[in-house]
């Protein structure tokens, strides 16, 4: 793999995730970490996801690479993980930010690596799916969230609840093999779930997970995606606020930390080609606990990349 020149990309250097080196220091990087410090700035009460990457990076310094007996190897070394820094975006400037995100990820894919990103709010998922689709045209989506983000979109443009609406309408994912899981709580408009169904997505509510159990959910997820290339979107508000209070739209009755991490362990071997972890809002966190959990989710994401079929 050629060494990557970041000079012409809209990136800014920041604290490396788990002290990972930059791409210039790797010769065969399989995973590139990218921060997406963007939010629409439109949430009526909880603006702050733009600060998510910096908080996750800070908490990642507490993590250690070895976790026996589950994995007794260093995933950063095995995958030659490189930290590309943060995309240089201005929150609220949607079209400009989306173009920059796509440009960075297109370059990352061209380098031979796969992206592991941290946001940022859910609006930033759309440009990432666009870039993934260009690399993997038969892409499917696995979306863990308390909201389906498949609302009817406003004529004025994008918002945090429409990323998967646009992904379906732009033909970026095969909706027949894509799924939302963990959905619960209140919605700001009537018919949100019905609209997601009309788009073709399968939706598993949190109440369904309570009945089938985590092992049952894992079976459903694996069967849905099969051997297809998977875009894994992990919205941190899929967790209960008791373990992840620092998110944009908390909703009680979610996954415990143990359950969420077990799901990630359970889908090992799927063909994960991109993962984004989003919606951490540091101003609403408690002692950095949500950001630390997000950093752990990203570490589990590295294991998923290590287990994907070659």
Predicted regions and their residues:
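Conserved alpha-helical scaffold segments that buttress catalytic/binding sites
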Residues: 2-310
